[in-house]
């Protein structure tokens, strides 16, 4: 069984083809991705209407690219999967519409996939896939959650952000420092030149006793510190010396990473599990990986990540999630081609609503 996956939830258009071979893990045959970063840079963030229009332009050429790379044709597709949510409504509608039209034209069933489940299962595409059960840290621009994962579709929410996500804290802090979009990676690069102990910033909810996160207060603290530094020099934040900006970037990153790492260790301790899966765009952060590796090593915990190019939104994770749901019997594909999307869709609702 071959599953074509289409991802269009935000500002990346992704298409991939995976193959299910018996009971072993599905195999990625080919994938292609187009990022809209350059287009959105002029606006300092994602413009939903522009994102939707660009998905329309890219999705079919990417599909042709994937089929050519895999040596397959449209006739070889058995199921067409797409991101149903969460995400930008207009962007989701593009992927859903193309997938359902393609399924109807080919007479093949379709399957809507939860975007976060795609991230959650993306490490199964790596050379060192995890085994169930495990604790998962889902950390991206829009979501920060800790989950207990006992199998495909068997997810228990342990904790989540009560305000900003970690990726949002990276991005908004970067904007406060005058860094270009996308801010998170820019802040991390600048942080490599800085002293993480230069500024004392808060670690919200670090000692709360639960596994929830909060990053809004940290973002405010970064803003206050940046304005204070600028006022002391009678200038703008952007005019601050590069080393000062680097120190503030490093201090910001250190605060975010410390919270993520310590909460993850607490989750492992509370569940007595010995595997940690890290997924989502922030999972590519080198400082986060280094500290998680160190702390997990002390505890005899195996930590798994997606391949770096699969940390961002991509079609491979959508195809893989669909294939694993079908393979495990969690869900059947549908030959009903009327579709809807769910811009807001808690992962905890997945089993009940699928």
UniProtKB/Swiss-Prot annotation:
Cofactor(s) listed in the protein's UniProt record: Fe(2+)
GO biological process: tRNA threonylcarbamoyladenosine modification
Co-factor binding comment: Binds 1 Fe(2+) ion per subunit.
Example of a GO cellular component annotation carried by this entry: cytoplasm
InterPro entries: ATPase_NBD (IPR043129), Gcp-like_dom (IPR000905), KAE1/TsaD (IPR017861), Peptidase_M22_CS (IPR017860), TsaD (IPR022450)
Major location (coarse): cytoplasm
The protein's Enzyme Commission number: 2.3.1.234
Catalytic reactions of this protein: L-threonylcarbamoyladenylate + adenosine(37) in tRNA = N(6)-L-threonylcarbamoyladenosine(37) in tRNA + AMP + H(+)
Binding site for substrate: 138-142, 171, 184, 285
Binding residues annotated for Fe cation, in chain numbering: 115, 119, 313
Enzyme superclass (EC): transferase
Entry's Gene Ontology molecular function annotations: iron ion binding; N(6)-L-threonylcarbamoyladenine synthase activity
TM helices/strands, residue ranges: none
Keywords for the protein's UniProt record, in alphabetical order: Acyltransferase, Cytoplasm, Iron, Metal-binding, Transferase, tRNA processing
Location of this chain's protein in the cell: Cytoplasm
Reported function: Required for the formation of a threonylcarbamoyl group on adenosine at position 37 (t(6)A37) in tRNAs that read codons beginning with adenine. Is involved in the transfer of the threonylcarbamoyl moiety of threonylcarbamoyl-AMP (TC-AMP) to the N6 group of A37, together with TsaE and TsaB. TsaD likely plays a direct catalytic role in this reaction.
Similarity comment: Belongs to the KAE1 / TsaD family.
Name of this protein: tRNA N6-adenosine threonylcarbamoyltransferase
Source species: Albidiferax ferrireducens (strain ATCC BAA-621 / DSM 15236 / T118) (Rhodoferax ferrireducens)
């Amino acid at each position: 069984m071959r599953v074509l996956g289409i991802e269009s939830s935000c500002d990346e258009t992704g298409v991939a083809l995976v193959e299910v071979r018996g009971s072993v893990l599905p195999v990625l045959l080919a994938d292609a991705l187009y990022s809209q970063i350059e287009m959105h840079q002029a606006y300092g963030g994602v413009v939903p209407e522009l994102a939707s229009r660009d998905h329309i332009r890219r999705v079919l050429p990417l599909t042709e690219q994937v089929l050519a790379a895999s040596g397959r044709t449209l006739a070889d597709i058995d199921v067409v999967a797409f991101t149903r949510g969460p995400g930008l409504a207009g962007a989701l509608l593009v992927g859903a519409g193309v997938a359902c039209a393609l399924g109807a034209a080919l007479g093949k069933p379709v399957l809507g996939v939860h975007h976060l489940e795609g991230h959650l299962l993306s490490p199964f595409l790596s050379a060192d896939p995890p085994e169930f059960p495990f604790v998962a840290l889902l950390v991206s621009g829009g979501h920060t959650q800790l989950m207990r994962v006992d199998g495909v579709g068997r997810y228990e929410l342990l904790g989540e952000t009560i305000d900003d996500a970690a990726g949002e804290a990276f991005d908004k802090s970067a904007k406060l420092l005058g860094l270009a979009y996308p801010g998170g990676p820019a802040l991390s690069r600048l942080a490599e030149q800085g002293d993480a102990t230069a500024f004392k910033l808060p670690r919200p909810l670090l000692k709360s006793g639960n596994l929830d996160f909060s990053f809004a207060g940290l973002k405010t603290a970064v803003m206050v510190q940046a304005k204070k530094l600028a006022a002391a020099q009678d200038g703008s934040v952007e005019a601050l010396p590069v080393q000062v900006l680097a120190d503030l970037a490093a201090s910001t990153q250190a605060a975010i990473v410390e919270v993520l790492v310590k909460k993850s260790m607490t989750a492992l301790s509370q569940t007595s599990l010995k595997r940690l899966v890290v997924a989502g765009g922030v999972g590519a952060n080198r400082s986060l990986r280094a500290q998680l590796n160190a702390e997990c090593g002390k505890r005899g915990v195996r930590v798994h990540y997606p391949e770096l190019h699969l940390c961002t939104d991509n079609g491979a994770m959508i195809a893989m999630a669909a294939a694993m749901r079908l393979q495990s019997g969690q869900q059947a594909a549908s030959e009903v081609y009327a579709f809807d999307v769910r811009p807001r869709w808690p992962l905890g609702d997945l089993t009940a609503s699928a």
